[in-house]
Amino acid sequence: MTLQLFHSTGLKLAATLVAGFISLNTPAAAKSNQTEESFSAEVTKMFAYKYLKYLPEGYDGKKKFPLLLFLHGAGERGDNLDLVTVHGPPKLIKKGKKFPFVVISPQCPRDSWWDAHALVGLLDSVIAMHAIDKSRIYCTGLSMGGFGTWELGSFYPERFAALAPICGIGRWPDSRDYTPFLMYKKPVWVFHGAKDSVVPLEESQRMVDALKRRGGKPKFTIYPEAGHDSWTKSYDNPKLYEWFLSHKTE
């Protein structure tokens, strides 16, 4: 399935920028060398996401189910959805595992990064077409998908009941356009390998520290002997999914 989304600030809208007018109190006889002008522009950007959809046993379109959004890493980008089944929940589903969630696993286009606003558009599309319990929407991702999880949790914390970024990079915690403190009240479970040479452990540590500085209580699991692949153990652990289901938005 393919989602096409036009957005500038996350939803389908056109941003109109109008230059403000500046007026100065000058003597009536004085001539001004400033003239009043205006500018307007329509800015749009298109995203097209293919995605895998898993419906749990018992789904009939009437009873509402929780939703798990899974974001893959950089190596699975492209236009072949088979790549998305290499890791994480899609891999487990392919092997026959049954989940109590609707699982949505989009594929990021080649040479692109996850965009939080486009992903929320995807979520809205899925919610509109399926019976989803909006109080139990969860997000997790690995590596580049861990970055996407941090992005979604920071820009749209109200949309998620819990988040689990795995070996992901977050933006600098104190930058003005990225505010992890918005998600400090959310349940967050972070995973990382101590010997990760691709995304250093410090990347997750500073995000965890940023949440704690603002009063958050994130869980942080460090695998002492793991390298970049800290996701296999994480996604194979039933406790992760039990933890997700134990949370819902108020």
Where in this protein do the model-derived segments appear?
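The conserved beta1-alpha1 loop
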Residues: L71-H72, C167, H192
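A domain-start/cap signature at the N-terminus of enzymes
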Residues: N25-L67, L142-F147, L152, Q205-D209, ...
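Gly/Ser-rich "nucleophile elbow"/oxyanion-hole loop immediately N-terminal to the catalytic nucleophile
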Residues: G58-K63, D111-M144, P157
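Alpha-helical scaffolding within the catalytic cores
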Residues: L81-K94, L122, I169-F181, E202
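Active-site machinery of serine-nucleophile hydrolases
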Residues: L67, L71-V120
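Bacterial N-terminal signal peptides that target proteins for export
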Residues: M1-A14
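C-terminal catalytic histidine-bearing segment of alpha/beta-hydrolase fold enzymes
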Residues: V188-F191, S197-E250
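Primarily recognizes the serine-hydrolase "nucleophile elbow" in alpha/beta-hydrolase
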Residues: M129, S135-M183
